[in-house]
A protein has these predicted regions:
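Phosphate/pyrophosphate-binding loops at sites that engage ATP/ADP/AMP, CoA/4′-phosphopantetheine
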Residues: 46-50, 163-178
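Catalytic domains of carbohydrate-active enzymes, especially glycoside hydrolases
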Residues: 40-56, 246
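Active-site loop-to-helix "anion-binding N-cap" substructures in soluble metabolic enzymes
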Residues: 45, 50-52, 90, 95, ...
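Short polar catalytic/cofactor-binding loops
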Residues: 20-24
Length: 272
């Protein structure tokens, strides 16, 4: 059975490296869409210090059309086995579909990074059947383009969601050590909603491990004025280090090397 607690015990704060096998992801679409480029990217992520590799075949970025389940599986069936074969660290699959999750686990993936934003019995059964890790993401609005009114307490809303998801998972017979919590920065939230989540990791991290995925996102561009997402890696690394110092257990990033450098500075303060 996969355990986030055991992985963190040996490594401390974890860096999850992003590997998108999509032509349309918001900052790196089309970069890893062949066997050779996938192997090169896996090796790069591992050499740079990734603790987990998160594979996505269906972009949920704003303004992108969600592909069919058939297309998502088609992208994965010839590339995912290559990724698992060449990875010396756990691999997660970024999907909201239980059939895709089951396929990925059959191919050797260890973690489901679930962006659905709702407890689903089919997904829960897949997680239970394979003893997989399960990351819950708070979705905000009905999709990545919408936002709802949190009445000034987005952190409270996210924590309530985490509590509900945790209870349902435990009631279903899934171990607490299999669970991870992602507050969903940039999903169904305004920039004003995203800001307090970054600043309130101390409260949010009462659900552990807390995952923060702020890499290259619009909030980084808003703060820094950097328009091109690919130019936001240094600022993203600073944000990741701040969230870890405030209690985040996992940071999901595009540039692992720069993030590891930032975390090494934080570790000197005795945080990690």
């Amino acid at each position: 059975m996969f355990s986030f607690a055991e992985l963190r015990e040996s490594k401390g704060a974890l860096v999850m490296g992003i590997l998108n096998i999509t032509p349309d992801s918001f900052s790196d679409g089309g970069e890893a869409f062949s066997p050779d480029s996938v192997i090169e990217k896996v090796n790069e992520l591992i050499n740079d210090g990734a603790d987990i590799i998160d594979v996505g075949a269906c972009s949920t970025a704003p303004n992108n059309t969600i592909i069919s389940e058939e297309e998502e599986l088609k992208r994965l069936e010839w590339l995912l086995p290559i990724i698992v074969e060449h990875s010396s660290v756990p691999v997660s699959i970024d999907t909201f579909r239980s059939n895709v999750a089951r396929f990925a686990l059959q191919k050797g993936v260890s973690v489901i990074n679930d962006e659905s934003g709702a407890f689903n019995n089919d997904m829960a059964q897949v997680v239970k059947d394979y003893g997989a890790g399960w990351i819950f993401m708070h979705p905000g609005g009905t999709d990545s383009k919408s936002a709802i009114d949190y009445n000034g307490d987005v952190t409270g809303a996210v924590m309530s969601f985490f509590g509900d998801m945790k209870k349902e998972a435990l009631d279903y017979g899934i171990s607490e050590s299999q669970l991870c919590y992602d507050c969903g920065i940039g999903f169904g939230k305004t920039r004003d909603d995203d800001m307090p989540q970054n600043a309130d990791c101390v409260r949010l991290s009462s659900f552990s491990p807390l995952l923060i995925g702020v890499s290259r996102k619009r909030i980084i561009g808003h703060i820094t004025g950097i328009e091109d997402p690919k130019d936001r890696d240094f600022a993203s690394a600073v944000a990741a280090a701040i969230t870890v110092s405030d209690g985040a257990g996992i940071v999901r990033v595009h540039n692992v090397a720069v993030t590891k450098q930032a975390l090494s500075i934080v570790s000197k303060k005795g945080v990690l």
